[in-house]
């Protein structure tokens, strides 16, 4: 993680979740990553990742997804990505990703997910690593535009909490997880 404050949050989160051995790096993954991988005998020991790549990067962020997937041998990835990332300039990366990995699900997220920060429409892509996507593979598409939360515009919010569970949000997220995990 390149941002120091986010790095600290990530480390604290892992410790609170009982994983004190996570080797989270504070720095640019393109500069620090190769050193880390070299020191781990050219393997990336993760079998799962959660990635929110910068949408301004090549392929609308899919270059980061492609790189993360290429460093894993097995496992799964969850990517919070610009919904149209797989088309236009992202098309080349999407094709390369699917040649080696399987898209399990695409989850359309609420329009106001990043209200006050960004107006980009996002989706979560769930991917199985190192299993080429076949033409007859079933992909689950979920419209999760109504997730049960009400959000306030972060720039205009006067409340400390701008996210309120107003319509069974926790149950809705549990249902989506159950659908995706089978």
Segment roles from a protein language model:
Residues 1-48, 54, 58, 81-84:
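Conserved S-adenosyl-L-methionine
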Residues 26, 43-182:
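A conserved structural/catalytic subdomain of Rossmann-like adenosyl-cofactor enzymes
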């Amino acid at each position: 993680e390149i941002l120091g404050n986010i790095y600290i949050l990530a480390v604290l989160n892992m410790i609170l979740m009982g994983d004190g051995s996570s080797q989270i790096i504070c720095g640019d993954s393109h500069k620090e990553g190769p050193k880390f991988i070299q020191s781990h005998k050219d393997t990336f020991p993760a079998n799962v990742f959660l990635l929110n790549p910068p949408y301004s990067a090549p392929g609308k962020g899919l270059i980061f997804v492609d790189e993360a997937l290429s460093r894993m041998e097995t496992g799964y990835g969850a990517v919070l990505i610009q919904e149209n990332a797989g088309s236009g300039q992202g098309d080349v990366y999407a094709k390369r990703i699917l040649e080696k990995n399987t898209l399990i699900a695409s989850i359309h997220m609420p329009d106001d997910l990043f209200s006050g920060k960004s107006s980009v429409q996002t989706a979560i892509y769930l991917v199985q690593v190192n299993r080429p996507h076949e033409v007859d593979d079933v992909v689950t598409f979920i419209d999760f535009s109504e997730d049960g939360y009400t959000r306030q515009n972060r720039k205009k919010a006067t409340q400390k909490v701008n996210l309120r569970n107003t319509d069974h949000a926790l149950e809705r997220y549990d249902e989506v997880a159950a659908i995706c995990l089978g």
